[in-house]
A protein has these predicted regions:
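Glycine-rich, aromatic-lined ligand/substrate-binding cores of catalytic
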Residues: 300, 309-310
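Calcium-binding acidic motifs and repeat modules
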Residues: 5
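Carbohydrate-binding surfaces of carbohydrate-active enzymes
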Residues: 304-306
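Beta-rich carbohydrate-recognition and catalytic domains
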Residues: 14-184, 188-236, 245-295, 308-309
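C-terminal motif of bacterial Sec signal peptides marking the signal peptidase cleavage site
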Residues: 9-12
């Protein structure tokens, strides 16, 4: 099975925090109309100076991690960390954009907003084709971290192709008492006939693997903890467990975003190669850390769901 395409992080410009000597976005003389300066003000044109043309950007406000990326009936649905109220971090919700070619994107209404359990942190979305959760066949189920003083895992479901969501009345589906368990990435594991969730353990530098028959009731199966000799402390976020075919065998790759202490400066994306039996991920004995990208700010990239063998 070929792995789905990996989407790069869509965080805002952070290079100035790392590369303070020179930044062309700041030092280059302005020759065109600049972007709006007031927080939350919408651009009059998508062609203003410095507007990215390849990477998706919303018309206004704060954006970071891609979330819930799923392919449905010819349309790619990109959800993302979004602040509907301003240009700074906070009020985190799931923004939403759609595309048929992953080049031309149409911004949609905000899909999920903070509720009594907290802000809506990163997560994933699946198509429940066999109605395992009881929300209806082909319901789109979003799985995300409810973030307040504690980070717990919650779900919401959609009956209109991912346009609007209803939060599950039984949330949170995974309870937790601290702020170091987040970013659920979920896929269907055919061999065990269960949904598999990988969860980042933050500053514990590892991940947890959970399983469920129905997306509502979850069992913790194992932990994968790594202590890389000679590496300073860093947090783990946005894990993704991906199968690949290699020399006629299936191998599994775990990618995880770490911050700080990337390969150069700032953040980075590590990967581990190994095997997964439905409960445990076991890494091969390789010279870790291995890096997906050697730039200064590669972060929060994860794979698309429901793309078949692509």
């Amino acid at each position: 099975m070929a792995a789905a395409a990996i989407a790069a992080t869509i965080t805002g410009c952070t290079d100035y925090d790392i590369q303070q000597d020179y930044n062309p976005l700041i030092d280059k003389p302005q020759t065109e109309e600049p972007a709006p300066e007031q927080p939350g003000e919408e651009a009059n044109s998508r062609n203003e100076q410095y507007r990215p043309q390849i990477h998706y950007t919303p018309a206004k406000n704060w954006i970071n991690d891609p979330n819930g990326m799923i392919y449905l009936d010819g349309t790619y649905h990109l959800y993302y960390q979004y602040n509907p109220q301003g240009n700074g971090w906070g009020n985190l919700s799931w923004g939403h954009a759609t595309s048929t070619d992953m080049l031309h994107w149409e911004e949609q209404p905000v899909a999920l907003q903070p509720d009594a359990l907290g802000m809506i942190f990163s997560g994933s979305a699946v198509c429940d084709k066999d109605n395992t959760a009881g929300f209806g066949a082909n319901a789109i189920v979003a799985l995300y971290t409810s973030a307040s003083a504690a980070q717990q895992q919650s779900i919401a479901y959609s009956h209109d192709g991912g346009k609007t969501f209803t939060t599950y009345e039984g949330n949170p589906v995974i309870k937790n008492n601290d702020d170091n368990l987040r970013d659920p990435k979920v896929f269907w594991h055919e061999e065990s006939k269960k949904w598999i969730m990988s969860l980042a353990k933050g500053w514990a530098r590892g991940m947890e693997i959970w399983s469920s028959p129905d997306l509502k009731n979850w069992t913790k199966e194992s932990e994968f903890i790594v202590n890389l000799t000679g590496r300073p402390s860093f947090q783990w976020e946005c894990p993704d467990l991906i199968p690949f075919e290699y020399n006629g065998k299936r191998k599994w790759v775990l990618i995880v975003s770490v911050n700080p202490c990337g390969p150069v400066l700032g953040s980075g994306t590590m990967y581990f190669v190994g095997d997964f039996d439905g409960k445990h991920f076991t890494a091969d004995d390789l010279d870790y850390p291995l890096w997906l990208d050697y730039g200064m700010d590669n972060y929060a990239g994860v794979t698309w769901n429901n793309t078949g063998d692509r």
